[in-house]
C-alpha cells in the first residue's frame, strides 16, 4: 500500500523557510534509513482574486525562494515518494472562486492546471475549509481526472467528524454523498483527527468511521505533529498503543498523516524528521508493543455515533506559518 510496504505515511510541508528565511530541508525524510514516507504534500496553493495571482503561501510558485524546495521535491519523486500539492486550507477563497459559473471556473482553474503541469505533481489534495457545493467539488474532481489521467492522485482532507456527520463539517458538501458519486476517483481522505474534530488517542473514532461504511484503506488518520500546530496532539506512548491496536485489527489500515513537518516532535525544528521516524516504527512493527502508562489500566468505551455529545466544536484556528521569514509583510 505505502512506500516500502507500510501503510501510507503522509507528511504535509507548508513552512518551507524559518523566520530568518533559511530553507527547511526535507532531505532527511528521503535519506534517513529509519524513515519511510510514502507521500509529501506541499502546501498551500491559493487561488486569489487575480486569476493570474496564484500563490504558494505568500509568493508565486515560481518565486526564487522556492527553487531549493522544488528541487528537493524532485529528489523525493526520484526516490519513489509521491509529491502532491495542497489546494486551500485555512485561507478562504480558492474554492469559492472554483464554485462559480463555468466561465469563471475556467478562468481560475487554468493557472492551477498550469502549475500542476509545470511542477510535475503526482496529485492534488483538496483541503476544502470553506462552503462549496457538491456539484462544484465534483466538477473540479472530474476536470482534474480528465486533464491529468488515471494515475493522478486526488485526495481530500475533511475533518474526521465530517465522515460521521455531515453537519460537523467545514466543506459545505456531504462527504458520504461525494464518496458515493465519485469515490472511484478519490485515492483517499486525509481525515483531520485533531482541533476538536477528532480523537486519535484511541482507535474508537477511527473504528466508528469504519462502522459508518468507510473503507479503511481510504481513511488516513490525520495527526498534528506537535501541540504547537493545533489541539489534539497525542503523546507518542499513547499514539503508539492506539496505532498498534488499529493495525492489529485492521490489516488494510490506510495510514497516518502529519501536519506539519518543520516543527514536528520529538525533534522540533532542530530534527523535524524524527516524527516520521517514530511513525515508520509504529506502522512497520510486526510484534505487539506493550505500553504502560503510570496508574493506567485498560479502558473499554462504547460510543453511540448518533448520540449528541454537546455543542458542535469550533473550527480550528488558522495556523501562523513562517513561509517568508518576513513576518511584517503578512
Where are these regions (language model features)?
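Chitinase-like catalytic core of GlcNAc-active glycosidases
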Residues: 2-240, 250-253, 262-286, 290-295
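C-terminal accessory extensions appended to soluble enzyme cores
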Residues: 240, 244, 254-257, 267-330
Amino acid at each position: 500500500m505505502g512506500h516500502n510496504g507500510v501503510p501510507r505515511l503522509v507528511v504535509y510541508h507548508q513552512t518551507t523557510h524559518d523566520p530568518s528565511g533559511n530553507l527547511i530541508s526535507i532531505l532527511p525524510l528521503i535519506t534517513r534509513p529509519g524513515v519511510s514516507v510514502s507521500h509529501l504534500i506541499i502546501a498551500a496553493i491559493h487561488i486569489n482574486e487575480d486569476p493570474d495571482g496564484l500563490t504558494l503561501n505568500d509568493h508565486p510558485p515560481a518565486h526564487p525562494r522556492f527553487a531549493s524546495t522544488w528541487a528537493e521535491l524532485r529528489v523525493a519523486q526520484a526516490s519513489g515518494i509521491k509529491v502532491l500539492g495542497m489546494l486551500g486550507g485555512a485561507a478562504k477563497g480558492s474554492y469559492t472562486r472554483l464554485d462559480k459559473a463555468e466561465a469563471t471556473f475556467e478562468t481560475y482553474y487554468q493557472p492551477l492546471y498550469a502549475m500542476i503541469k509545470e511542477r510535475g505533481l503526482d496529485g492534488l489534495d483538496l483541503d476544502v475549509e470553506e462552503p462549496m457545493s457538491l456539484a462544484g467539488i465534483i466538477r473540479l474532481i472530474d476536470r482534474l481526472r480528465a486533464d491529468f489521467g488515471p494515475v493522478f492522485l486526488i485526495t481530500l482532507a475533511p475533518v474526521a467528524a465530517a465522515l460521521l456527520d455531515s453537519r460537523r463539517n467545514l466543506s459545505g458538501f456531504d462527504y458520504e454523498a461525494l464518496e458515493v458519486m465519485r469515490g472511484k476517483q478519490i485515492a483517499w481522505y486525509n481525515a483531520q483527527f485533531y482541533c476538536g474534530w477528532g480523537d486519535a488517542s484511541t482507535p474508537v473514532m477511527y473504528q466508528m468511521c469504519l462502522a459508518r461504511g468507510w473503507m479503511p484503506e481510504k481513511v488516513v488518520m490525520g495527526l498534528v505533529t506537535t501541540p504547537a500546530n493545533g489541539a489534539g496532539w497525542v503523546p507518542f506512548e499513547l499514539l503508539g498503543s492506539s496505532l498498534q491496536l488499529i493495525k492489529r485489527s485492521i490489516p488494510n489500515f490506510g495510514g497516518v498523516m502529519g501536519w506539519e513537518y518543520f516543527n514536528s516532535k520529538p525533534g522540533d525544528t532542530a530534527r523535524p524528521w524524527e516524527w516520521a521516524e517514530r511513525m515508520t516504527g509504529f506502522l512497520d512493527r510486526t510484534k505487539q508493543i506493550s505500553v504502560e502508562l503510570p496508574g493506567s489500566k485498560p479502558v473499554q468505551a462504547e460510543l453511540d455515533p448518533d448520540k449528541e455529545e454537546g455543542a458542535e466544536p469550533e473550527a480550528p484556528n488558522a495556523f501562523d506559518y513562517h513561509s517568508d521569514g518576513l513576518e511584517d509583510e503578512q
